């Protein structure tokens, strides 16, 4: 019997956690078609660019990468090997047929809601004409994407993403997500629980629930009642084997009582929340259509801290939004100083075509913040954020913290895991600790990574008792 050699697949993903998750599901979708992953695009039979449309010149970066892939594709053709190129993700959704017009080497253009149709699109592309699908049948995507095989789950490690929600209804004036991912749609509770159970049965210990606006989750449960994210977390915490639960990314407006209570009542929900605010200026927040004030955001932070004092936060910030004044920027610095973040991401404003903010700046060019001013503000903000992150990390030295060990580190004999706050932590230990949550005494800090040693049994018990007493005090 002659065995057909597997076809090789290379996926390059840009941007958010949702794209990482989507890349895995594309791998699962194409596995029955005989595709296996490769890290080398030069040996791939299919290359997929899984794109992001959030940042400046996203489309141009894609076309630049397509130029490099064209050379690889032509070289493959000279050796008698056919190579297909697909563009997926939010640039595919936004640009559509324009991609194949500008880059004739592209065979498939597929939006985020149509990945389950990849085999059909590839078959269509074999006829010579490019296959393009950028519709919005998002319910079909959730129901039609195949579940990963047990071997694939185990190979991906002890932490996994689970999509619970997709799309956004907020229409922030700077953002393209509602136009590229569509309106908010939530998966049924039963489907999410089934996915999580399958992951747990195959060695996953930590689940991160993801969505463009994850705390807007409003899926139906088995009784037809609408479930909040907080109630969903309660359901997932009951699954055997799941030690940690996270979620990302959240909108301050959608933090409700049930989510606060989940942080109070469920030890598995990690005390680390990514809660983007974008600006500390009420004037800029209004121009962004965020529908909350800086004071609203601070009150939300305080609600979390009241029920879980050890909780920490990260955030996103945009500097140089159209019309941002020195006072507006000073308000942002003041908010960052008041909150005290464990980390944050800051970016210069970049106009996204078709968004209200881009139109606003185009209509009134005086609103545009000069590039040099944006650079200066970004450097100042990032320096403050970096100092806060360094201080937060240094505070771990000398403490015993719980670490979920994920994999072997680059240095021989070391195993790396993550703390409750997603800090990498390295110890010298046997690989058999991978998948376990163990107490680690932190001895030092190297850049953003903690280094320590497995705590002695006596230290571990004392640490866990201390944590338990704190939990009882805060309940």
Curated annotation (Swiss-Prot):
Any one Pfam family match given in the protein's UniProt record, by short name: UPF0004
Q: What is its EC number?
A: 2.8.4.3
MTTase N-terminal domain location is: 7-127
Summarize where [4Fe-4S] cluster 1 binds, as residue positions. Answer: 16, 52, 90
Please give the GO cellular component terms listed in this UniProt entry: cytosol
Q: Which cofactor does it need?
A: [4Fe-4S] cluster
Which residue ranges does the record assign to the Radical SAM core domain? 154-388
Q: Under which name does UniProt file this protein?
A: tRNA-2-methylthio-N(6)-dimethylallyladenosine synthase
């Amino acid at each position: 019997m002659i065995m057909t050699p597997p076809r090789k697949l290379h996926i390059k993903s840009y941007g958010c956690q949702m794209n990482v998750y989507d890349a895995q599901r594309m791998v699962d979708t194409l596995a029955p078609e005989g595709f296996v992953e490769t890290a080398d695009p030069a040996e791939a039979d299919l290359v997929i660019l899984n794109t992001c449309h959030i940042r400046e010149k996203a489309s141009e970066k894609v076309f630049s990468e397509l130029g490099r892939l064209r050379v690889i594709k032509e070289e493959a053709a000279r050796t008698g090997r056919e190579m297909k190129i697909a563009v997926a993700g939010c640039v595919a959704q936004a640009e559509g047929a324009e991609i194949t017009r500008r880059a004739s080497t592209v065979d498939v253009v597929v939006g985020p809601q149509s990945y389950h149709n990849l085999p059909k699109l590839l078959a269509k592309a074999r006829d010579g004409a490019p296959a393009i699908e950028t519709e919005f049948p998002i319910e079909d995507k959730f129901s039609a994407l195949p579940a990963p095989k047990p071997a694939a789950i185990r190979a991906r490690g002890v932490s996994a993403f689970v999509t619970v929600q997709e799309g956004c209804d907020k229409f922030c004036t700077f953002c393209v997500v509602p136009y590229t991912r569509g309106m908010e749609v939530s998966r049924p509770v039963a489907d999410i629980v089934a996915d999580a159970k399958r992951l747990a049965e195959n060695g996953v210990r930590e689940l991160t629930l993801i969505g463009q606006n994850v705390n807007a989750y409003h899926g139906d449960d088995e009784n037809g009642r609408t479930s909040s994210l907080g109630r969903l977390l309660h359901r997932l915490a009951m699954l055997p084997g799941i030690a940690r639960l996270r979620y990302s990314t959240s909108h301050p407006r959608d933090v409700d009582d049930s989510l606060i209570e989940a942080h109070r009542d469920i030890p598995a929900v990690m005390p680390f929340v990514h809660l983007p605010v974008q600006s500390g200026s009420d004037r800029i927040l209004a121009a962004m259509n965020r529908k909350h004030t800086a004071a609203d955001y601070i009150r939300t932070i305080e609600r979390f801290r009241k029920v879980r004092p050890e909780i920490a936060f990260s955030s996103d910030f945009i500097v140089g939004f159209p019309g941002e004044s020195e006072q507006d920027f000073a308000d942002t610095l003041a908010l960052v100083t008041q909150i005290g973040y464990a980390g944050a991401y800051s970016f210069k404003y970049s106009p996204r075509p078709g968004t209200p903010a881009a139109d606003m700046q185009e209509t009134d060019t005086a609103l545009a913040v000069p590039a040099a001013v944006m650079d200066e503000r970004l450097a100042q903000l990032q320096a403050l954020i970096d100092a806060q992150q360094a201080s937060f990390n240094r505070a771990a030295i000398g403490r015993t913290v719980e670490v979920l060990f994920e994999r072997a580190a680059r240095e021989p004999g070391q195993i790396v895991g993550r703390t409750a706050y997603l800090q990498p932590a390295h110890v010298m230990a046997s690989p058999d600790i991978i998948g376990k949550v163990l107490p680690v005494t932190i001895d030092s800090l190297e850049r953003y990574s903690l280094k320590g040693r497995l705590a002695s049994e006596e230290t571990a018990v004392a640490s866990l008792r201390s944590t338990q007493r704190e939990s009882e005090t805060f309940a």
